[in-house]
Regions:
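Residue-level detector of Asp-centered blade-edge/turn motifs that repeat once per structural unit
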Residues: 68-71, 125-128, 182-185, 240-243, ...
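Conserved beta-propeller blade signature
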Residues: 73-75, 130-132, 187-189, 245-248, ...
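N-terminal secretory signal peptides and thylakoid transit peptides that target proteins
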Residues: 1-17
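Gly/Pro-rich loop segments of beta-rich domains
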Residues: 31-62, 92-119, 148-176, 206-234, ...
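A short loop-to-beta-strand structural motif that recurs across blades of beta-propeller domains
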Residues: 82-86, 139-142, 197-200, 255-258, ...
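Blade-level signature of beta-propeller repeat domains, shared across WD40, Kelch, NHL, RCC1
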Residues: 348-376
Length: 376
Protein backbone atom coordinates (compact mmCIF):
# COMPACT_ATOMS: atom_id res chain seq x y z
CA UNK A 1 0.00 0.00 0.00
CA UNK A 2 1.44 3.39 -0.93
CA UNK A 3 1.71 6.37 1.41
CA UNK A 4 -0.59 8.36 -0.87
CA UNK A 5 -3.24 5.66 -0.52
CA UNK A 6 -2.87 5.67 3.26
CA UNK A 7 -3.23 9.44 3.34
CA UNK A 8 -6.36 9.19 1.22
CA UNK A 9 -7.82 6.69 3.70
CA UNK A 10 -6.98 8.75 6.75
CA UNK A 11 -7.95 12.15 5.31
CA UNK A 12 -11.60 11.15 5.34
CA UNK A 13 -11.33 10.06 8.98
CA UNK A 14 -9.35 13.01 10.38
CA UNK A 15 -7.41 10.82 12.04
CA UNK A 16 24.89 0.36 23.40
CA UNK A 17 27.36 -2.05 22.13
CA UNK A 18 30.86 -1.18 21.02
CA UNK A 19 29.61 -1.16 17.48
CA UNK A 20 26.86 1.23 18.48
CA UNK A 21 29.35 3.45 20.26
CA UNK A 22 31.27 4.16 17.08
CA UNK A 23 28.23 4.63 14.88
CA UNK A 24 27.53 8.25 13.97
CA UNK A 25 24.76 9.70 16.10
CA UNK A 26 21.90 11.14 14.11
CA UNK A 27 20.68 14.68 14.65
CA UNK A 28 16.93 15.16 14.90
CA UNK A 29 14.78 18.24 15.35
CA UNK A 30 12.94 16.72 18.31
CA UNK A 31 13.54 14.22 21.06
CA UNK A 32 13.93 10.69 19.76
CA UNK A 33 12.64 7.89 21.92
CA UNK A 34 11.30 4.36 21.68
CA UNK A 35 8.46 2.95 23.74
CA UNK A 36 6.44 -0.24 23.91
CA UNK A 37 2.87 0.21 22.68
CA UNK A 38 1.67 -3.41 22.80
CA UNK A 39 2.76 -6.58 24.59
CA UNK A 40 4.29 -7.43 27.94
CA UNK A 41 7.38 -9.29 26.79
CA UNK A 42 5.73 -12.67 27.45
CA UNK A 43 4.06 -14.69 24.71
CA UNK A 44 0.40 -15.36 25.30
CA UNK A 45 -3.20 -14.51 24.62
CA UNK A 46 -5.98 -13.15 26.81
CA UNK A 47 -9.58 -12.92 25.55
CA UNK A 48 -10.34 -9.23 25.14
CA UNK A 49 -14.11 -9.13 25.47
CA UNK A 50 -16.13 -6.52 23.64
CA UNK A 51 -14.18 -3.52 24.93
CA UNK A 52 -10.67 -4.78 24.35
CA UNK A 53 -7.71 -4.76 26.72
CA UNK A 54 -4.98 -2.23 27.46
CA UNK A 55 -2.36 -3.08 24.83
CA UNK A 56 0.68 -2.53 27.05
CA UNK A 57 -0.77 -4.86 29.70
CA UNK A 58 -1.82 -7.58 27.26
CA UNK A 59 0.44 -10.37 25.97
CA UNK A 60 0.95 -10.77 22.24
CA UNK A 61 2.60 -13.69 20.51
CA UNK A 62 5.37 -13.28 17.94
CA UNK A 63 4.04 -10.28 16.01
CA UNK A 64 5.20 -10.03 12.39
CA UNK A 65 3.48 -7.84 9.79
CA UNK A 66 2.24 -4.40 10.80
CA UNK A 67 0.23 -1.68 9.05
CA UNK A 68 -2.08 1.26 9.71
CA UNK A 69 -5.67 0.72 8.70
CA UNK A 70 -8.12 3.01 6.93
CA UNK A 71 -9.60 3.80 10.35
CA UNK A 72 -6.28 5.13 11.66
CA UNK A 73 -5.75 2.15 13.97
CA UNK A 74 -2.65 -0.04 14.05
CA UNK A 75 -2.96 -3.66 12.89
CA UNK A 76 -0.47 -6.50 13.28
CA UNK A 77 -0.53 -10.26 12.74
CA UNK A 78 0.81 -12.94 15.07
CA UNK A 79 2.61 -15.70 13.23
CA UNK A 80 2.22 -18.28 16.01
CA UNK A 81 -1.50 -17.81 16.75
CA UNK A 82 -2.73 -16.80 13.31
CA UNK A 83 -4.55 -13.82 14.76
CA UNK A 84 -4.67 -10.28 13.42
CA UNK A 85 -4.90 -7.71 16.21
CA UNK A 86 -6.13 -4.12 16.13
CA UNK A 87 -4.75 -1.44 18.42
CA UNK A 88 -6.71 1.79 18.77
CA UNK A 89 -4.06 4.51 18.88
CA UNK A 90 -6.44 6.85 20.69
CA UNK A 91 -7.42 4.56 23.55
CA UNK A 92 -4.46 2.17 23.49
CA UNK A 93 -6.80 -0.81 23.60
CA UNK A 94 -6.27 -4.09 21.78
CA UNK A 95 -8.80 -6.37 20.07
CA UNK A 96 -8.68 -9.30 17.66
CA UNK A 97 -10.20 -8.77 14.21
CA UNK A 98 -9.32 -12.04 12.45
CA UNK A 99 -8.32 -15.55 13.44
CA UNK A 100 -9.52 -18.05 16.04
CA UNK A 101 -6.07 -18.96 17.32
CA UNK A 102 -5.78 -22.25 15.44
CA UNK A 103 -3.08 -22.77 12.81
CA UNK A 104 -5.02 -24.02 9.80
CA UNK A 105 -6.51 -22.97 6.47
CA UNK A 106 -10.23 -22.85 7.15
CA UNK A 107 -13.09 -20.39 7.25
CA UNK A 108 -13.56 -19.12 3.70
CA UNK A 109 -17.09 -17.84 3.27
CA UNK A 110 -17.50 -17.16 6.97
CA UNK A 111 -16.64 -14.48 9.53
CA UNK A 112 -12.99 -13.54 10.06
CA UNK A 113 -13.04 -14.28 13.79
CA UNK A 114 -14.15 -17.87 13.14
CA UNK A 115 -11.50 -18.51 10.47
CA UNK A 116 -8.14 -20.17 11.00
CA UNK A 117 -4.98 -18.67 9.51
CA UNK A 118 -1.68 -20.52 9.14
CA UNK A 119 1.46 -18.52 9.95
CA UNK A 120 0.40 -15.09 8.67
CA UNK A 121 3.51 -13.10 7.85
CA UNK A 122 2.14 -9.80 6.61
CA UNK A 123 -1.07 -7.81 6.30
CA UNK A 124 -2.07 -4.94 4.02
CA UNK A 125 -5.15 -2.90 3.18
CA UNK A 126 -6.21 -2.18 -0.38
CA UNK A 127 -7.62 1.16 -1.45
CA UNK A 128 -11.17 -0.03 -0.67
CA UNK A 129 -10.27 -0.87 2.92
CA UNK A 130 -10.26 -4.66 2.59
CA UNK A 131 -7.69 -6.47 4.75
CA UNK A 132 -5.31 -8.90 3.01
CA UNK A 133 -3.37 -11.60 4.87
CA UNK A 134 -0.52 -13.66 3.42
CA UNK A 135 -0.12 -17.11 5.03
CA UNK A 136 3.26 -18.81 4.78
CA UNK A 137 2.18 -22.31 5.81
CA UNK A 138 -1.13 -22.34 3.92
CA UNK A 139 0.55 -20.96 0.77
CA UNK A 140 -2.28 -18.49 0.15
CA UNK A 141 -3.31 -14.86 0.31
CA UNK A 142 -6.75 -14.20 1.79
CA UNK A 143 -9.02 -11.19 2.06
CA UNK A 144 -11.27 -9.99 4.87
CA UNK A 145 -14.10 -7.90 3.43
CA UNK A 146 -14.24 -4.42 4.94
CA UNK A 147 -18.03 -4.41 5.26
CA UNK A 148 -19.08 -8.02 5.84
CA UNK A 149 -15.87 -9.28 7.55
CA UNK A 150 -16.20 -12.44 5.45
CA UNK A 151 -12.99 -14.27 4.48
CA UNK A 152 -12.11 -15.39 0.95
CA UNK A 153 -8.98 -16.63 -0.83
CA UNK A 154 -7.55 -14.38 -3.54
CA UNK A 155 -4.39 -16.32 -4.48
CA UNK A 156 -3.15 -19.86 -3.94
CA UNK A 157 -4.78 -23.26 -3.62
CA UNK A 158 -3.58 -24.23 -0.16
CA UNK A 159 -1.04 -26.65 -1.66
CA UNK A 160 2.63 -25.73 -2.05
CA UNK A 161 4.00 -25.59 -5.57
CA UNK A 162 4.53 -23.40 -8.59
CA UNK A 163 1.83 -23.27 -11.22
CA UNK A 164 -0.94 -21.17 -12.68
CA UNK A 165 0.75 -18.20 -14.31
CA UNK A 166 -1.55 -16.33 -16.71
CA UNK A 167 -4.59 -18.00 -15.18
CA UNK A 168 -6.90 -17.44 -12.19
CA UNK A 169 -4.92 -16.61 -9.05
CA UNK A 170 -7.04 -18.96 -6.94
CA UNK A 171 -6.00 -21.87 -9.16
CA UNK A 172 -2.29 -21.02 -8.98
CA UNK A 173 0.16 -22.52 -6.50
CA UNK A 174 2.45 -20.53 -4.23
CA UNK A 175 5.20 -21.81 -1.96
CA UNK A 176 5.67 -20.17 1.44
CA UNK A 177 4.65 -16.64 0.45
CA UNK A 178 5.94 -14.11 2.96
CA UNK A 179 5.04 -10.57 1.93
CA UNK A 180 2.44 -8.59 -0.02
CA UNK A 181 2.07 -5.02 -1.22
CA UNK A 182 -0.17 -3.06 -3.56
CA UNK A 183 1.13 -1.00 -6.47
CA UNK A 184 -0.48 2.26 -7.54
CA UNK A 185 -2.90 0.66 -10.02
CA UNK A 186 -4.24 -1.67 -7.33
CA UNK A 187 -2.42 -4.84 -8.39
CA UNK A 188 -1.14 -7.11 -5.62
CA UNK A 189 2.52 -8.16 -5.44
CA UNK A 190 3.44 -11.35 -3.56
CA UNK A 191 6.89 -12.40 -2.36
CA UNK A 192 6.67 -16.07 -3.32
CA UNK A 193 9.93 -16.81 -1.55
CA UNK A 194 9.75 -20.60 -1.77
CA UNK A 195 9.58 -20.26 -5.55
CA UNK A 196 12.20 -17.51 -5.73
CA UNK A 197 9.77 -15.18 -7.44
CA UNK A 198 7.66 -12.06 -7.05
CA UNK A 199 4.16 -12.80 -8.35
CA UNK A 200 1.64 -10.21 -9.48
CA UNK A 201 -2.15 -10.50 -9.21
CA UNK A 202 -4.15 -8.30 -11.56
CA UNK A 203 -6.95 -7.32 -9.20
CA UNK A 204 -9.22 -6.29 -12.06
CA UNK A 205 -9.44 -9.77 -13.58
CA UNK A 206 -7.91 -11.89 -10.75
CA UNK A 207 -5.19 -13.43 -12.94
CA UNK A 208 -1.66 -14.09 -11.71
CA UNK A 209 1.74 -13.80 -13.39
CA UNK A 210 5.42 -13.71 -12.46
CA UNK A 211 6.81 -10.19 -12.20
CA UNK A 212 10.39 -11.20 -11.46
CA UNK A 213 12.50 -14.20 -10.52
CA UNK A 214 13.29 -17.49 -12.21
CA UNK A 215 12.93 -20.05 -9.44
CA UNK A 216 16.72 -20.43 -9.16
CA UNK A 217 16.83 -19.95 -5.40
CA UNK A 218 20.61 -20.11 -4.96
CA UNK A 219 21.59 -18.08 -8.02
CA UNK A 220 22.99 -14.60 -7.25
CA UNK A 221 20.95 -11.57 -8.19
CA UNK A 222 22.90 -9.15 -10.41
CA UNK A 223 23.21 -5.48 -9.49
CA UNK A 224 20.91 -4.51 -12.34
CA UNK A 225 18.87 -6.21 -15.00
CA UNK A 226 15.40 -6.85 -16.41
CA UNK A 227 12.64 -7.93 -14.05
CA UNK A 228 11.80 -10.81 -16.34
CA UNK A 229 14.32 -13.63 -16.28
CA UNK A 230 16.50 -12.34 -13.42
CA UNK A 231 16.98 -14.68 -10.42
CA UNK A 232 16.05 -13.39 -6.96
CA UNK A 233 17.97 -14.77 -3.98
CA UNK A 234 15.40 -14.94 -1.22
CA UNK A 235 12.69 -12.38 -2.07
CA UNK A 236 11.43 -11.84 1.48
CA UNK A 237 9.62 -8.51 1.82
CA UNK A 238 8.52 -5.54 -0.24
CA UNK A 239 6.80 -2.18 -0.12
CA UNK A 240 5.83 0.31 -2.82
CA UNK A 241 5.78 4.03 -3.51
CA UNK A 242 3.39 6.15 -5.57
CA UNK A 243 5.76 6.30 -8.57
CA UNK A 244 5.43 2.66 -9.58
CA UNK A 245 8.49 1.43 -7.72
CA UNK A 246 8.61 -1.60 -5.45
CA UNK A 247 11.40 -2.00 -2.91
CA UNK A 248 12.39 -5.60 -2.38
CA UNK A 249 14.43 -7.11 0.46
CA UNK A 250 16.41 -10.24 -0.38
CA UNK A 251 16.84 -12.33 2.76
CA UNK A 252 19.61 -14.64 1.53
CA UNK A 253 20.89 -11.94 -0.81
CA UNK A 254 21.35 -9.46 2.08
CA UNK A 255 20.38 -6.56 -0.17
CA UNK A 256 17.61 -4.18 -1.17
CA UNK A 257 16.52 -3.73 -4.78
CA UNK A 258 14.36 -1.16 -6.51
CA UNK A 259 11.92 -2.75 -8.95
CA UNK A 260 10.74 -0.29 -11.58
CA UNK A 261 7.48 -1.92 -12.60
CA UNK A 262 6.95 0.55 -15.44
CA UNK A 263 10.35 0.16 -17.08
CA UNK A 264 10.62 -3.52 -16.19
CA UNK A 265 14.05 -3.16 -14.55
CA UNK A 266 15.60 -3.87 -11.16
CA UNK A 267 18.61 -2.28 -9.47
CA UNK A 268 20.47 -2.95 -6.24
CA UNK A 269 20.33 0.14 -4.01
CA UNK A 270 21.47 -1.15 -0.60
CA UNK A 271 23.59 -3.99 0.71
CA UNK A 272 26.64 -5.59 -0.85
CA UNK A 273 25.28 -9.11 -0.58
CA UNK A 274 27.69 -9.99 2.21
CA UNK A 275 26.55 -10.65 5.77
CA UNK A 276 27.48 -8.04 8.35
CA UNK A 277 26.44 -4.83 10.02
CA UNK A 278 28.57 -2.13 8.52
CA UNK A 279 28.22 1.06 6.54
CA UNK A 280 26.37 3.45 8.82
CA UNK A 281 26.98 7.05 7.79
CA UNK A 282 27.91 6.05 4.26
CA UNK A 283 26.23 4.93 1.05
CA UNK A 284 23.66 2.20 1.48
CA UNK A 285 25.13 0.41 -1.52
CA UNK A 286 28.30 -0.34 0.47
CA UNK A 287 26.53 -1.34 3.70
CA UNK A 288 26.03 -4.90 4.89
CA UNK A 289 22.96 -6.61 6.35
CA UNK A 290 22.30 -9.93 8.03
CA UNK A 291 19.10 -11.64 6.95
CA UNK A 292 16.86 -8.59 6.42
CA UNK A 293 13.18 -9.50 6.57
CA UNK A 294 11.09 -6.33 6.42
CA UNK A 295 10.91 -2.97 4.67
CA UNK A 296 8.74 0.14 4.62
CA UNK A 297 8.79 3.13 2.32
CA UNK A 298 8.13 6.49 3.99
CA UNK A 299 6.98 9.39 1.82
CA UNK A 300 7.45 11.74 4.79
CA UNK A 301 11.23 11.64 4.53
CA UNK A 302 11.58 9.73 1.22
CA UNK A 303 13.41 6.95 3.01
CA UNK A 304 13.38 3.20 3.36
CA UNK A 305 13.17 1.60 6.79
CA UNK A 306 14.81 -1.82 6.65
CA UNK A 307 14.37 -4.54 9.27
CA UNK A 308 17.87 -6.01 9.66
CA UNK A 309 16.48 -9.01 11.50
CA UNK A 310 19.53 -11.06 12.42
CA UNK A 311 21.32 -7.86 13.48
CA UNK A 312 18.32 -7.02 15.69
CA UNK A 313 18.17 -3.51 14.27
CA UNK A 314 16.20 -1.08 12.12
CA UNK A 315 18.22 0.69 9.45
CA UNK A 316 17.14 3.78 7.50
CA UNK A 317 18.33 4.70 4.03
CA UNK A 318 17.52 8.08 2.54
CA UNK A 319 16.52 7.74 -1.09
CA UNK A 320 17.51 11.38 -1.60
CA UNK A 321 21.12 10.99 -0.42
CA UNK A 322 21.65 7.22 -0.39
CA UNK A 323 23.05 7.42 3.15
CA UNK A 324 22.21 4.65 5.63
CA UNK A 325 22.11 4.68 9.43
CA UNK A 326 20.80 2.58 12.29
CA UNK A 327 17.82 4.24 13.97
CA UNK A 328 16.87 1.51 16.45
CA UNK A 329 18.79 -1.33 18.06
CA UNK A 330 22.33 -2.01 19.22
CA UNK A 331 23.24 -4.92 16.98
CA UNK A 332 22.86 -7.34 19.89
CA UNK A 333 19.84 -9.37 20.91
CA UNK A 334 17.96 -8.30 24.03
CA UNK A 335 14.79 -6.72 25.35
CA UNK A 336 14.91 -2.95 25.61
CA UNK A 337 15.01 -0.83 27.57
CA UNK A 338 12.59 1.73 26.18
CA UNK A 339 13.91 5.27 25.92
CA UNK A 340 17.10 5.85 23.95
CA UNK A 341 16.76 3.92 20.67
CA UNK A 342 20.53 3.49 20.38
CA UNK A 343 20.47 1.56 23.68
CA UNK A 344 17.29 -0.46 23.07
CA UNK A 345 17.97 -4.07 22.19
CA UNK A 346 15.59 -5.98 19.95
CA UNK A 347 15.04 -9.70 19.35
CA UNK A 348 14.65 -10.64 15.69
CA UNK A 349 12.24 -7.92 14.59
CA UNK A 350 10.26 -8.61 11.41
CA UNK A 351 7.80 -5.82 10.61
CA UNK A 352 8.08 -2.06 10.18
CA UNK A 353 5.61 0.62 9.15
CA UNK A 354 5.54 4.42 9.31
CA UNK A 355 2.36 6.25 10.26
CA UNK A 356 1.62 9.79 11.44
CA UNK A 357 5.26 10.60 12.16
CA UNK A 358 6.01 7.37 14.04
CA UNK A 359 7.95 4.27 13.03
CA UNK A 360 6.24 1.13 14.34
CA UNK A 361 8.25 -2.08 14.72
CA UNK A 362 7.21 -5.62 15.60
CA UNK A 363 9.89 -6.79 18.03
CA UNK A 364 8.91 -10.35 17.29
CA UNK A 365 10.74 -12.57 19.76
CA UNK A 366 10.29 -10.04 22.56
CA UNK A 367 6.53 -10.29 21.87
CA UNK A 368 6.20 -6.52 21.72
CA UNK A 369 5.26 -3.76 19.33
CA UNK A 370 7.47 -0.69 19.70
CA UNK A 371 7.04 2.88 18.51
CA UNK A 372 10.04 4.98 17.47
CA UNK A 373 9.20 8.66 17.79
CA UNK A 374 11.05 11.76 16.64
CA UNK A 375 12.83 10.42 13.55
CA UNK A 376 10.25 11.56 10.98
Amino acid sequence: MTDSTRRQFLRSLGVATAAAAVRPRLAFAQEVRVRTVAGTGVAGYEPEGSGGLVATQTPVNNPYGIVAGPDGALYFCEVDTGRTRRMDLGTGRLTTVAGNGEAAYTGDGGPALAASFSAPHEIRFDRDGHLFVVERDAHVVRRVDAQTRVVSTVAGTGEAGFSGDDGPATEAQLRQPHSIAFVANGDLLICDIGNGRVRRVNMRNSTISTLSGTGERRAPTPDTGPLDGTPLRGPRSLDTDSDGNAYLVLREGNAVYRLDTGAGRLQRIAGTGEQGMTGDGGPGSTATFNGPKGIAYSASDHSLYIVDTENHAIRRMSLATGIIDTVLGTGERGDGPDGDPSQCRLARPHGVFTHAGVVYVTDSENHRVRALEGVL
